[in-house]
Amino acid sequence: TLRRSSAASDVYKRQGIRFQTAPDQPYSMITTHVRFRENDTKTQQLTLGVIGVNLIYGAFYQNDRPKKMLQYLYDHIDRDAIEIDTINFTGPLFEDIDNRVMSLELVRLGMTDAVMFGPDGNNLLPARELYKKNIIAIRGSFRPVTKVNVDMYRKSLSIFEKEPDSDPDNSLVIFEITLSNLMTTGAIDEEDFMDRAKLLCSLGQTVMISNFKEYYRLAEYFSEYTKKKIRLTMGVNNLIEIFNEKYYRNLSGGILEAFGKLFFKNLKVYLYPIIDPETGKITDSNTLRVNPRLKELYNFFKYNDKVVDILDYNTEDMKIFSRDVLEQIKKGEKGWENKLPEGVSKLIINKKLFGFKSK
C-alpha cells in the first residue's frame, strides 16, 4: 500500500524483490524506499509498476553490476516524478557490496538529496529517523575525524541539553558530509569515503551524505520532517561563508530568501571559534567580520539569539586541522595520533586507512 505523509504531495512506498538465480540457492534481496513527487494516484501507480519491472530486470540481469542496476531503475520514468532515498542489497549475490557505497551512489546519481546510515553501518530511512526529532547537525570533511570535531559535538550536545524542552531522548545528532566534500580531488574516491565512514561509525555516530552545499537547503530538508529544534554546529569560517552572496544568485530573493529559509523559528547556529595560530587571537560571534553591507543583517540574527557561541574550548585542540593530519598520515610523519579521538588512530593503523603505511 501507498503511505501518504502530512504533505499532500508526498507519498512513500517500500518495494523489493527476493530472488534466486539458481535452484536451491539461498535467496538474495533488493529493497528500496521511494518517495513520489507527483500528486495523481493513477500516475503514481503506473510509475510504481514501471520501477517494479525495472527492479525485476535489474535483479536477474544486472545483479553482478549493482551500480549499473541503479541507473536502470529510472528507465522510462521521469526523474522528477520519484525519488529513491534508500536501497539495500542482501544475500549471497551481494556479499561483497557495502550498502553505504550504494547509498552514496544514490546521491551521486541525483536519485535523492540525502542518505543516512547508523553506527552499525546499515542504511537508515531519513523520513523515519528525522520525523518529529530534535536535530543537531555537524558538517565537516572528517578526513579524518579529529579532537576538534568531537569537541564540537560534545559541547553542542551540552549546550542543547541545557535548553528548555530539549528532550534528549527524542534528539538525533548527525555528522554530515556533503557530496562536494567527498570530491576534494575532483571525483569521488570510494575508499576515502569508506575510511571516513568507518571512523565515524566506530565513534557511534549517525552519518548523513547530502547534496546540500548551501546550509539553507539542509535546513529546508530537515524542516520537511520535523517542526522541533534544529541546531547547526559550525566553525566561524563556515558562518562567514554563509554571508557570501555568491551562493544565492540562483534565488530570486537572493540572500534574504536564503536566510528566511535558514534562520526560521526553531533553528539556531552553535558557533565554534577559531584561533590565529600565530597571534593566539580568538574569533567568535562577537568579533567575526562579515561584508559591511550585511553587518546589520548579521547583527539581527546575533541579537535574536540565533547564533550561540560554544565556550569552554581547548585552545590547543583548535590548532588541529584535518588536512594537516591527513598529510602527516600519508607522509608517515609522527605526532598525528594525539590529534585524534581515543581509538581512532589505532583503527587507522590497523585498517591502514587514509593511505597509512606501516614502516
Label for each model-derived stretch:
Residues 5-359:
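Nucleotidyltransferase catalytic core that binds NTPs
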Residues 1-2:
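Short, well-ordered junction/capping motifs at the entry into regular secondary structure
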